[in-house]
Curated annotation (Swiss-Prot):
Tyrosine sulfation occurs in the female only and plays an essential functional role. It comes from Drosophila melanogaster. InterPro entries: AB_hydrolase_fold (IPR029058), Lipase (IPR013818), TAG_lipase (IPR000734). The lineage of its organism: Eukaryota, Metazoa, Ecdysozoa, Arthropoda, Hexapoda. The keyword Phosphoprotein applies. This is Vitellogenin-1. It is found in: Secreted; Vesicle. Residues 158-175, 416-433 have a biased composition (Polar residues).
Length: 439
């Protein structure tokens, strides 16, 4: 049976059961639906057909409605635990941005030959970004662009100083429309802190997986393990053919790309016996399709250090802890302050990380151990300070909460007092916390 028909069949089954005169389900159906969320017939009928379920549609819904819809679809997919992934994209495009705004673009299987032509590539830090949503969304496109710009500014800081450039120069495609839209907020303002920021050089690679996930069917049915293994093998090949150190690689994944990044890191370890230095998940997604008897998803142990930023736990994101340390801006919720829909909420993790990458902003997001925003507020934000973003300490563990601004600059850079324990403790969520915490 086509796996994508499972959701429709389950929906019909649930509608028929709910339509019984006594309003109760027989034991077999009742058992089959556990632990899914109960839905009325009208709610099930309101769920759009897969062909109509697009990122644009989610962007046109308010945050609460979009989060509710995604929760319903996810729970339906988990009823029988038999929605198997079947999509492994081919011809994934990769690009390497240049300081002048140009890009080197090639399919994944051709990029290594292009990299060999770049002088000194891989001698310093290499950051690999795996996108998880299509760039057809302006929200997604902008967040990814901000992250790339931030790294280009960070890696070319010394060159900027030598040529007298300031922070007003962004590295991006030099079209009129993009120039018109660039630097619309204070997160990119050049400050005195930049003058004192540490100099660092490196290279950035963007694996644009998200552009292959242009339908919900592809997104939901993505085979995370096989796609990640493909990227992991590519990283091994790159390290070997370019004779570059593997311990300078930082792998970053957005949304479902976070899980693919984790799988890629696992494949790298399987093939080499070594772990990558760091994997960062930017709002890791819920996983709809899962292979039986296989643990899937970003997790601690995928690299020497795994960190995750969760900005739409009850929307596009997942409530499942994904790293050695998990950060929850404004606590676990459907979204974060200033995000009007689930797509914007999901991409805020990328915006926050991008802000921390910019020279001088490395410690703009101080956080403290807590398992809810309520607990954070009860302690007035006091606790052992840790920093979310590029400067996160690699020996950090546990759950961390922080508050963020609704608009850029998002980081509050608020003080936090010391406590005896350095590590946060993984605790159960406070299920009584309501949605007001993220408004």
């Amino acid at each position: 049976m086509n796996p994508m028909r499972v959701l429709s069949l389950l929906a019909c089954l649930a509608v028929a059961a709910l339509a019984k005169p006594n309003g109760r389900m027989d034991n077999s159906v009742n058992q089959a639906l556990k632990p899914s969320q109960w839905l009325s017939g009208s709610q099930l009928e309101a769920i759009p057909a897969l062909d109509d379920f697009t990122i644009e549609r989610l962007e046109n819904m308010n945050l609460e409605r979009g989060a509710e819809l995604l929760q319903q679809v996810y729970h339906l997919s988990q009823i029988h635990h038999n929605v198997e992934p079947n999509y492994v994209p081919s011809g994934i495009q990769v690009y390497v941005p240049k300081p002048n705004g140009d890009k080197t673009v090639a399919p994944l299987n051709e990029m290594i030959q292009r990299l060999k032509q770049k002088q000194n590539f891989g001698e310093d830090e290499v950051t690999i970004i795996v996108t998880g949503l299509p760039q057809t969304s302006e929200t997604v496109k902008k967040a990814t662009r901000k992250l790339v710009q931030a790294y280009m500014q960070r890696y070319n800081l010394q060159q900027q100083r030598q040529h007298g450039k300031n922070g007003n120069q962004d590295y991006q495609d030099q079209s009129n429309e993009q120039r018109k839209n660039q630097r619309t907020s204070s997160e990119e303002d050049y400050s005195e802190e930049v003058k004192n920021a540490k100099t660092q050089s490196g290279d950035i690679i963007v694996i644009d997986l998200g552009s292959k996930l242009n339908t919900y069917e592809r997104y939901a049915m993505l085979d995370i393990e096989k796609t990640g293994a493909k990227i992991g093998k590519w990283i091994v090949q790159m390290v070997n053919e370019l004779d570059m150190p593997f311990d300078t690689i930082h792998l970053i994944g957005q949304n479902v790309g976070a899980h693919v990044a984790g799988a890629a890191a696992q494949e790298f370890t399987r093939l080499t016996g070594h772990k990558l230095r760091r994997v960062t998940g930017l709002d890791p997604s819920k996983i709809v399709a899962k292979s039986k008897n296989t643990l899937t998803g970003l997790a601690r142990g995928d690299a020497e250090f795994v960190d995750a930023i969760h900005t739409s736990v009850y929307g596009m994101g997942t409530p499942i802890r994904s790293g050695d340390v998990d950060f929850y801006p404004n606590g676990p919720a459907a979204g974060v302050p200033g995000a009007s829909n689930v797509v914007e909420a999901a991409m805020r993790a990328t915006r926050y990380f991008a802000e921390s990458v910019r020279p001088g902003n490395e410690r703009s997001f101080p956080a403290v151990p807590a398992n809810s925003l309520q607990q954070y507020k009860q302690n007035d934000g006091f606790g052992k300070r840790a920093y979310m973003g590029i400067d996160t300490a690699h020996d950090l563990e546990g759950d961390y909460i922080l508050q963020v601004n609704p608009k850029s600059p998002f980081g509050r850079n608020a003080p936090a007092q010391k406590q005896s324990s350095y590590h946060g403790v993984h605790q159960a969520w406070n299920t009584n916390q309501d949605s007001k915490d993220y408004q």
